Each structure stands twice: as C-alpha cells, then as structure tokens.
Amino acid sequence: MVGISELSKEVAKKANTTQKVARTVIKSFLDEIVSQANGGQKINLAGFGIFERRTQGPRKARNPQTKKVIEVPSKKKFVFRASSKIKYQQ
C-alpha cells in the first residue's frame, strides 16, 4: 500500500518541486473532492473515474447472536467508479 508520503515523494520528483508542496497539493485536491461530493456533486475525472456521495436506503438485517431482525437506517456512502481505461489496464 502506498501512503501520502510515498505518493508526494513521487509527485514532487515528476513536478520538480518539494515534497512539502506536493503533499499540500495532494491533500487540498482530496479535500476538495470530498467537499464537492458532500455538497451533492459528482466529480468526473476523465480517464480516471467518478467520485460521488450516494444514499443507501434502509434495510433489514439479522443479529447473528439473537437471530432478531433489526431495521438498519439509511446512510450516505462515498463511492468511486473507476473508468474503463484504468479498470482494464494491465
């Protein structure tokens, strides 16, 4: 798994800048994606994928210990759908 420090190191090399600047740009970019998705927007990055916030409706679930059926309330999920360009890339 690659963390933000490894990612910022590689971005800094390719952008010919410092790792600190690269880390700030990456964090700002990710914060803005989350902010826009939370505001109800779909973020479409051509050739990469779509980020969005979706509502999962309420559902029934079973407690495995008591076997009792419970109602699970609806919740908002953060979803990413990969572009076919990267989904099937080798």
From Swiss-Prot:
The keyword DNA-binding applies. GO terms for cellular component: cytosol. Keywords: DNA condensation, DNA-binding. InterPro entries: Hist_DNA-bd, Histone-like_DNA-bd_CS, IHF-like_DNA-bd_dom_sf. GO terms for biological process: chromosome condensation. GO terms for molecular function: DNA binding; structural constituent of chromatin. Pfam families: Bac_DNA_binding. Belongs to the bacterial histone-like protein family. Histone-like DNA-binding protein which is capable of wrapping DNA to stabilize it, and thus to prevent its denaturation under extreme environmental conditions. Homotetramer. This is DNA-binding protein HTa. It comes from Thermoplasma acidophilum (strain ATCC 25905 / DSM 1728 / JCM 9062 / NBRC 15155 / AMRC-C165).
